[in-house]
């Protein structure tokens, strides 16, 4: 195909048409799909309970099953997670639930690590949540999994 008549300057040729070659489609970058709160919670709970054996963590995930809004758009994430945690662990003494909550907060800020190594996520989440000094029960829970903070 030849250039359209009167088109001397290629800056005015539509993007999909390049007069020097046949039709050329140029790729348009797409933005990644936003990560939802449910996706973050599901990953955090999968990391905290890979065998899916802890009923409290199953209940915690149930608290987020309808949370389909992008995690970056949530203004009160800490409050929402705290309410969900209190709903399954009133005394807030279950280290698995505490680590799941810490992992939710960590992954909400570091969505690029959603598919990272589970041990690394747990270690980094504990460091971020408790500034490297988690409560003894959480430190013991992590040590049982071979994770040092």
Where are these regions (language model features)?
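Acidic, polar-rich N-terminal leader regions of halophilic archaeal proteins
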Residues: 2-149
